Amino acid sequence: MLSRLFAPKVKVSAHCDLPCGVYDPAQARIEAESVKAIQEKMAANDDLHFQIRATVIKEQRAELAKHHLDVLWSDYFKPPHFESYPELHTLVNEAVKALSAAKASTDPATGQKALDYIAQIDKIFWETKKA
């Protein structure tokens, strides 16, 4: 009797672990903007303590950006999106690799490269939201 009481009445499915529906590449972009801004600040400040703190924060922000891209890739984008945008797998992969390069560098160009890839992913994301 209890099993019938607690049995689901309606079967539902979700695209992620929790069907919140809140996805946005802006999260990755903001973290990547932080990476680039930190790289620029590092170039203008040679204080050792600042450099160490900036390096730690830059690496954390790059990891967060990579995480947000991974969530988009694994939870938001679905097979129909990859069929419509066959370059999407490569774009996400290149963006993540660019963020890894930015972690290992103080050159703002590496941060900008990650931002450029994220901008392309953002464009595709919003096109899929219109569909």
Swiss-Prot record:
Keyword match Ion transport: no
GO CC terms in record: cytoplasm
Reported impact of residue 15 to A/C/D/K/N/Q/R/W/Y: Loss of activity
Effect of residue 23 to F/W: Slight decrease of activity
GO molecular function, one term: nickel cation binding
Keyword Metal-binding included in the entry's annotation: yes
Matching SUPFAM superfamilies: Nickel-containing superoxide dismutase, NiSOD
Lineage: superkingdom: Bacteria
Subcellular location as annotated: Cytoplasm
Family matches, as InterPro entries: NiSOD_sf, Superoxide_dismutase_Ni-type
Cofactor(s) essential for the protein: Ni(2+)
Effect on the protein upon substituting residue 31 to A: Loss of activity
Pfam families listed in its UniProt record: Sod_Ni
EC number assigned by the record: 1.15.1.1
Catalysed conversion reaction: 2 superoxide + 2 H(+) = H2O2 + O2
Main localisation: cytoplasm
Residues annotated as binding Ni(2+): 15-16, 20
Propeptide stretch(es), residue numbers: 1-14
Keywords assigned: Antioxidant, Cytoplasm, Metal-binding, Nickel, Oxidoreductase
Subunit annotation: Homohexamer. The hexameric protein has roughly the shape of a hollow sphere with an outer diameter of 72 Angstroms and a large inner cavity.
Family: Belongs to the nickel superoxide dismutase family.
Protein name as annotated: Superoxide dismutase [Ni]
Lineage: Bacteria, Bacillati, Actinomycetota, Actinomycetes, Kitasatosporales
